[in-house]
From Swiss-Prot:
Pfam families: LamB_YcsF. It is an enzyme of class 3 (hydrolase). It catalyses: 5-oxo-L-proline + ATP + 2 H2O = L-glutamate + ADP + phosphate + H(+). GO terms for molecular function: 5-oxoprolinase (ATP-hydrolyzing) activity; ATP binding. Its EC number is 3.5.2.9. The gene is pxpA. This is 5-oxoprolinase subunit A.
Length: 250
């Protein structure tokens, strides 16, 4: 059995530091790098690409809404054509840095509000999938299972990678609990590790609003903006490896 461990990175902007890139890169197997719209100034993106290269971490594009002030966590009413163009633009921007450093683009995973909107809005999901397909039909797209986002990615003929979140709470409907909801963040590293094991080995996890929810996980996400993200990533990886799960990029 194997699973990927991913984290968001490269989200600092100029003098404004964000996340724990240097601490978390040695612990994960893939990283989703900001592309300049929600975070990531050119110098910071290049820095993150070089860190990934040094640690053998697979690099994916992490396109978001054009919202630096809100860090891409505020939903925007963009047309499908605007979403398509924005995603294509951001993939291209990151690809320039990867080409300069001799690295391939490994996957695409939307950020924040764009990811969540794609999970429930079919037109947004389709626009993302078509942008990825237009850039490279062989690029994997990371999705939340059981959503219209997964459906549209499959319709586009893309390789779909199913994602789960050990440090985010789920609702019974399979969606992530809103960040504003008490208990939506799992901050204890050992609890996150326990949840990760259940997700990978049992295919389920407890829901915040009661009962359990089925989970399919080919990659597990650790949010880089979690205050103790390195500790969570370390605990999750150690627990998986001790259970005999191979942790490597998909």
């Amino acid at each position: 059995m194997k699973v990927d461990l991913n984290a968001d990175a490269g989200e600092s902007y100029g003098a404004f530091a964000y996340g724990h890139d240097r601490e978390i890169f040695p612990l994960v197997t893939s990283a989703n790098l900001a592309c300049g719209f929600h975070g990531g100034s050119p110098g910071r993106i290049l820095e993150a690409v070089r860190l990934a290269k040094a640690h053998g971490v697979a690099v994916g594009a992490h396109p978001g809404f054009p919202d630096l002030v809100g860090f891409g966590r505020r939903e925007m009413a963009l047309s499908p054509e605007e979403v398509y163009a924005d995603v294509l633009y951001q993939i291209g921007a990151l690809s320039a840095f990867l080409k300069a450093e001799g690295l391939p683009l490994h996957h695409v995973k939307p950020h924040g509000a764009l990811y969540l909107k794609a999970c429930r809005d079919r037109e947004t999901a389709r626009a993302i999938a078509l942008a990825v397909k237009a850039f490279d039909p062989g690029l994997p797209l990371v999705v939340l299972p059981g959503t219209v986002y997964e459906e549209e990615a499959r319709k586009a003929g893309l390789r779909v990678v199913l994602e789960a979140f050990p440090e985010r709470a789920y609702l019974r409907n399979g969606q992530l609990a809103p960040r504003s909801m008490p208990g939506s963040w799992i901050t204890d590293p050992e609890e996150a590790a326990r949840r990760a094991l259940r997700m990978v080995l049992e295919g389920k996890v407890e829901a915040l609003d009661g009962g359990e929810v089925a989970v399919r996980a080919e990659t597990l996400c650790i949010h880089g903006d979690n205050p103790n993200a390195p500790e969570v990533a370390r605990a999750v990886r150690e627990a998986l490896e001790q259970a005999g799960v191979e942790v490597r990029a998909f």
